[in-house]
């Protein structure tokens, strides 16, 4: 589990727009940094939306 997030890996979560998760893997969260983003992606904090490593992030394209 991410120390900055109460979400469980791969589970549902109630992250808000202010979510500070570093590597949130919640399937229901659209505000956390995505696993398909490169490390240090500055745009993750701006609401990057993608669901997994097989999907390219629109914010990182």
Swiss-Prot record:
SUPFAM superfamilies: Metallothionein (SSF57868). Residues 30-61 are annotated as: Alpha. One of its GO terms (molecular function) is metal ion binding. Keywords: Cadmium, Copper, Metal-binding, Metal-thiolate cluster, Zinc. A divalent metal cation 4 binds at residues 33-34, 44, 48. A divalent metal cation 3 binds at residues 15, 19, 24, 29. GO terms for cellular component: cytoplasm; nucleus. A divalent metal cation 7 binds at residues 50, 57, 59-60. A divalent metal cation 2 binds at residues 7, 13, 15, 26. A divalent metal cation 5 binds at residues 34, 36-37, 50. A divalent metal cation 6 binds at residues 37, 41, 44, 60. GO terms for biological process: cellular response to cadmium ion; cellular response to copper ion; cellular response to zinc ion; detoxification of copper ion; intracellular zinc ion homeostasis; negative regulation of growth. Pfam families: Metallothio. A divalent metal cation 1 binds at residues 5, 7, 21, 24. Residues 1-29 are annotated as: Beta. Monomer. Class I metallothioneins contain 2 metal-binding domains: four divalent ions are chelated within cluster A of the alpha domain and are coordinated via cysteinyl thiolate bridges to 11 cysteine ligands. Cluster B, the corresponding region within the beta domain, can ligate three divalent ions to 9 cysteines. Metallothioneins have a high content of cysteine residues that bind various heavy metals; these proteins are transcriptionally regulated by both heavy metals and glucocorticoids. Belongs to the metallothionein superfamily. Type 1 family. This is Metallothionein-1B. It comes from Homo sapiens (Human).
